[in-house]
Amino acid sequence: MKRILYLALAALLLMGCSEDRSQILKVYNWADYIDEELLDEFEVWYEEQTGEKVEIIYQTFDINETMLSKIELGHEDYDVVCPSDYIIERMLKNDLLLPLEREFGDTPDYIGNVAPFIREKFDEIEGYGKNANDYSVAYMWGTVGLIYNPKYIAEEEASSWNVLRNPAYKGKVLMKDAFRDVYTALLVALNKDDIDSGKADLVSLPFDTSEKSISLVENYLNSFKESIAGWEADFGKEQMTKELAWINLSWSGDAQWAIDEAAEIGMDLRYSIPDEGSVVWFDGWVIPKYAKNIKAARYFINYMCMPENAVRNMDMTGYVSVIGGNEVLEAMSDEEEYDALDASYFFGEDADSVSVNPTMYPDNSTIMRCGMMHDSDTEALLKMWSRVKGDNASAWTYILICLVFAGLIAAVIIKYTRKRYRIKVSRKHKTRRKNRPRY
């Protein structure tokens, strides 16, 4: 049996040797996270720009750990991958990324369209002296906050995380099952006084996984644990639109989906980033060290930074592109729909009073209260999360191990399959992730 397996693997390797990778671009992205018509259009655009043909092999994943295991352990030769912020940090630490050269000949450098705010945040992502801005380009971003139903919860009360502790909402609270997001958001909130006084700052605080800080967050979670109706990965949006839950700690992308769905049935749902502070998250394009078509990968990332493509991706996914500038601002402005807010941090100093969606582009004063997540002591945070939920901590370890091995098995099966795994999105604002765990 072992001999048969070895022969099969050898055959796959020989097949790989004969593959002309200069005409193939392997892209590995989150499911439902791109306007897939852009994939075909890129192939045409790339030939126009370079005179060379390329065919995209597009595959999707639902969990960061699956993607990472294929690259780190399976040495998969994906050319472009879209990991989350803390995974980019981990890949930098583990020497899994190639530097991103920005020479495109006569083709403009569209990467310069990334909003300065995003570039500043990526400056906070480092691994052994390597800066994320030299090895990655941000793609989408968002925040962590509260989806709430104003029929039951007042706007003023939803402006504080303490709304979760109100015993009147017992059984009506949902918690996103994402330990890193929740921990960092609450850590920032619980240290508001120290941040305001200068004893702590939003850059270094999210790295803090000391026993004291973990206990602080754990005790806070336990203070309203009895009110939590469920720890949701994806069902929270539906529970909110059915009024089975009144408040949900979640991501801004899920919030926008729920708000849109609720509006279609005449329901009012809203999103709040509490005054005590929260966190922002990012996903970005990288070129793994085992990539084979680096040139096409660079051009693909550049292509995704064109303003018109950024708007199309937002329309398709419902998430927020990192691309700023007047073209995107004009597309996203709606004076009849939204009150004016200060989005100068994203669109430039002239955008200090613009009518954009506050769920997608929070006011400057709100964003300045948000830190960002980092790749910090996953094991300790998992144990805390398991204690709060009442899970068996070893079960999480087992799940992670299974994900790694499942990823390797899948890698062998699909490594040389050239079928395009392109999932058709059925609605404009369908969320791209049924599960977005940050392990």
Q: What are these regions, as identified by a protein language model?
A:
Residues 15-16:
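C-terminal motif of bacterial Sec signal peptides marking the signal peptidase cleavage site
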Residues 19-94, 393-397:
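Early extracytoplasmic/lumenal segment of secretory-pathway proteins
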Residues 59, 65-68, 85, 89-141, ...:
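Hinge/lid segment of periplasmic solute-binding proteins
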Residues 91-100, 130-133, 258-273, 336-340:
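Ligand-binding "clamshell"
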Residues 108-110, 215-222, 265-289:
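Periplasmic-binding protein-like
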Residues 175, 182-186, 194-270:
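Ligand-binding pocket segment of bilobal, Venus flytrap-like solute-binding proteins
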Residues 288-364:
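Mature extracytoplasmic/periplasmic domains
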Residues 352-439:
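Conserved C-terminal helix/tail region of periplasmic/extracytoplasmic solute-binding proteins
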